[in-house]
Amino acid sequence: MVKRGLALLLVGLLGGCMQATLAPSSNASLTSRDRQLLAHARYAQATIPETYRRHIVDYTRKEQPGTILVDTNSKYLYYVLPGGKAIRYGVTVGEEALAWSGIATVGKTAEWPDWIPTAEIQARLGPYPKRVAGGPDNPLGARALYLYEGNKDTLYRIHGTNQPEYI
């Protein structure tokens, strides 16, 4: 279980606590598997508005470096860095996740995770196979952080997407 002090704090209002964007972060390093899976992804050319791209921003709240905050109203995720900075990412928060708030730890991480749609998701958005293998057609995207309360999986994830146009 990964516990490197990462905590998730869902916050309703973070307005006014962030300064101007300093500069876009450099592109993430892609593994050879990432490059192979993304080579022909239908969303490879999706345009994400500049404001929702990854940026390093000033951060003046009290959370410690390593903390992850999700601002559901502004649709941003902040990864707190040392020195009053944070990496800000544009996000979409699913309807189910809006029902939960609190503090959790990252209990597990996965690259190209499989997705097992719940019965509720099947009824609302399906039909899907019982299991969708990791890859460019999987709604969880390339990475997932599994959120735990104590030793219990909350079933909530911070994950990528195969639909960046909805960010």
Predicted region positions:
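Gly/Pro-biased beta-strand-loop elements
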Residues: 41-164
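Bacterial Sec signal peptide processing site at the extreme N-terminus
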Residues: 15-38
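C-terminal/domain-terminus segments
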Residues: 8-10, 162-167
